[in-house]
Amino acid sequence: MRKTSTIIFRLLLWGLLAALPQVAFPQLDAKTLMQAQRNGINNPLYGNNPYENGEDEENLPPNPADTAKEKRIRKPLESYFFNDSIRALNNFLWTISRDYNRVKIEPLDTTLQDWRIDYPFYRKGVGDIALGPLGQASMPTDYFERPRYENFSFSQAYDAYTYNLENVPFYNVKKPYLQMTYLESGQKKFREEQFGLTVAHNISPSTGFNINYKARGTRGQYDRSRTKNHNLEVAFSHTGKRYSIHAAYINNHIEQEENGGVVGEWAIVDTTFEMPSGVPMRLASAEAENIFRNNAFFVEQSYGIPLLPVTESDFSIAHLPAVYIGHTFEYNSWSKIYSDIRSTYVDDRGSRDENGNFVPTEHSFYKNWYINPLQSRDSIYERIISNRFFVQAQPWNRNGVVGTLNGGVGLDLHTYSQFAMDTYLTGEYRKTKKTGFYVYGSIDGKIRRYVDWGADFRLYPSGYRSGDLSVGANLALSAKVKGHPLILEGRFRMERRSPSFWDENLFSNHFVWFTPLSKETDTRFEVTFRVPDYALEVGAKQGVVTDKIYYGADALITQAPGAVSLTSVYARKDFRIGGLHLDHRVLLQWSSDQEVIPVPLASAFLSYYYEFWVVRNVLRLQIGADCRYNTNYYSPGYNPALSAFYNQREVRTGNYPYTDLFVTGKWKRMRIFLKYQHINKGLWGNGEYFSTARYPLNPGMFKIGLSWGFYD
């Protein structure tokens, strides 16, 4: 009897073991499974081991098969957001759309490309109009790349540094991911420092969390140029087969001492100081400072309802007709405190006498002192609470001719706080509340691999910003010639938008206005042609702005009647001859009214370097130089009390090649760089190294950086 039971038990056990492979891979046929196992992949739907492939990792031999024990196979990533090529990546990140149930895949920052560019505002296009030191305000040189904040426009100048609801990254990693970065430069007394930490971990293939923290700042080469920026982002995501959720908390803290720029260009061009801190600044004795605080939280959820039965062979519902319903909640608050004390500065070359000799002149930086004639402490606050409900229809499949039809409604609750004349003495804030209601929608699709198209709109039918409208469309055509992809893209966007609250209402010690403004209309056309395999990109943009709102020559809010047109042509071509890289980015811009939209005629970023293996698959180096340049024009000025750029008409800047010499390397997972910034100071150029009027860029200094990634 005992022998019979033993035989039956063994037969049942063998049958169970024989059935295990079929249970583990219900979606794979035998041929696919054998090919995957031959390539050392335990589960091809979950991707490769990050240590087995790629330049970034060690090429370790696969582990020998364990015939004694079968490994438990994890459920693969089944989200409709990601296609097979994305799932196969070892690590990837994405951002989520605030309005639509869509994600955008972004590259991980683990390569040598652009690693040497330590200022974040220099990483795109031809660069930015910047005050100089790390952590201070900047604005893209390319007019079409400049952000326009509808809410709390005072933080717009720090867009390159801050986390916001549009750029929060979410990660999917096969192994726990940790990356640490540290960069420093200059003497201890004037040091610039950057520290970055990224931690990402997946609890399951579909569920993960990540933390990003950045601390950037400088003690300042020039007097009163200390900055301190802290940016924290904590995010959680679950991208399941039907249900997905993205949630994140953001904290941005910015402190910037304000020096007002040099008393005169002569202090940089014609005078040599023993230390940069000796250069006379216009607000050096005013103790001026800006402090920004931002707290934000959002959660976006969606649930997919397939319209056809889901079988075991359906890896995701991306290829099935489906309807998705979702909701987005946002909380976002910003505050700004500007403080200073009344003081004057002396320009030793302010004027000339009848004999042509310089005569010192005394000036006051601010013309008006409305509240307190001795000191300022301007405090403003803005909060927005937003709810969106959306529906997304997927008629056939997510990448079909009509991929998705989207529609939604949103409700925004705005609160604005600032002092008023009748409440300033009591210390009470005056609060203004507004409610905005809007509807929006879009449609997009794909015709095989050759055509991508889409259109969208947003309309405010009532409430705050009533009548605002945004309409856009895009079309991308793809083809291959001898195996090389060619991409032609066209975009159109028309926006009719109300002025922001602060454009019409501001009460502070130096600026007061309560002026209703008309809606601004901005129409743009864009065409781009790209050949990725040959590192070639050319494009043209045309814009027409009617009733443009801007800060005029006196830094007061201004609205230009009529239309202003702006045309730009952009070209990028990277040449490679063996290990020699010759990278070029050139931008040409024409404005019909330079007093309203001032832009340089030509701007360029050139990078020439040689890249080679020191030790094959172990250590790779780049040695070269970067140069930024723009033609002479009336560059924007910067006003500390507003934290905004304005269209000054007194000083022209440009015609200066700002050049850096660098050596970067990657040793396995560690990246390093050595750089001498502004190596041409005093050697070539006209000596006018200004990007913003009266704000000199940093003088020459040595930098060193280290970034180390851990994937286990």
Locate the predicted segments by residue.
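Small/flexible residues
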Residues: 4-5, 12, 40, 574-575, ...
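Exposed, low-structure sequence patches enriched in small/polar residues
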Residues: 173-175, 284-347, 351-712
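Membrane-proximal, glycine/serine-rich, low-complexity loop/turn segments characteristic
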Residues: 27-295, 304-318, 478-486, 694-699, ...
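A generic structural signal for short coil/turn motifs at secondary-structure boundaries
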Residues: 18, 187, 219-223, 462-464, ...
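Bacterial Sec-dependent N-terminal signal peptides
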Residues: 1-35, 675, 699-712
